[in-house]
Amino acid sequence: MTGLLAGRTALVTGGTAGIGRGIAEVLALHGARVAVTGVTEERCAQAREDGLDVYQLDVRDKKACIRVVNDVAAECGGLSVLVANAGVYPQVRLADLDDDQIDFIFDVNVKGMMHVVQAATPALRESGRGRIVVTSSITGNITGYPGWSHYGATKAAQMGFIRSAAMELAGDRITINAVMPGNIMTPGLKALGDDYLAEMAKAVPLGMLGEAKDIGEAVAYLASDGARYVTGQSIVVDGGQILPEGPEALAEM
């Protein structure tokens, strides 16, 4: 434990598994009291067994977001950090996308994010040093991947929201920023198999895939007093994946 976030209470949506779980664990290691949300009772139950403060939440439900944020603030001694991490990323080719799929991903990734930010703002304002960190993606405004046009659109929307929200929240000394993960080793990614993962790693200049804790460390910085003068920005955590020259240039050096 470093004490970087000592005295802080953080809420991580979608924090029962994957990147969100990694973020929650890192924030706790830095001294924060951490509450997480999950959409399914199964994941919530597992996280409770692991000793986390867990709240079941579907971020599409605005009233539920308000209720959960108020519960966290009341039961955990306030709220000073919100990590809007909950999201979905189904792969669907553009030609196969239908309106229901588009509505679903925007309802979760965009409206859901906005719901939790709106719900948390009063408690963050009261804390006197509120921090909001959104888990976005390099597909938001830097690069793209086949099958994720709808996902990339939601992440671009998040970044537009962050920049404008930063202007509105600044008067309350609340900062809002994003982390943009590259290829991060999650259970879903591991399921693709070792050979596929090895090929993915070759596309990263550092020669390896990231881990959820790498995202967590970036979030911890943005949630800390060290980032008090940073707002409306994003940190890319991708091992150099988006660098224009790519690994081929490194091989020639």
Place the predicted regions along the sequence by residue.
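Short C-terminal tail/terminal secondary-structure segment
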Residues: 231-253
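C-terminal helical subdomain
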Residues: 171, 178, 199-230, 237-239
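Short, small/polar-rich loop/turn modules that mediate ligand/substrate recognition or access, typified
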Residues: 83, 129, 170, 175, ...
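Alpha-helical segment proximal to the catalytic Tyr-Lys
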Residues: 122, 167-168, 228
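Substrate-binding pocket helix/loop in short-chain dehydrogenase/reductase
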Residues: 93-94, 101-106, 200
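Conserved glycine-rich cofactor-binding loop
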Residues: 9, 16-18
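Active-site helix of classical SDR
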Residues: 117, 154, 162
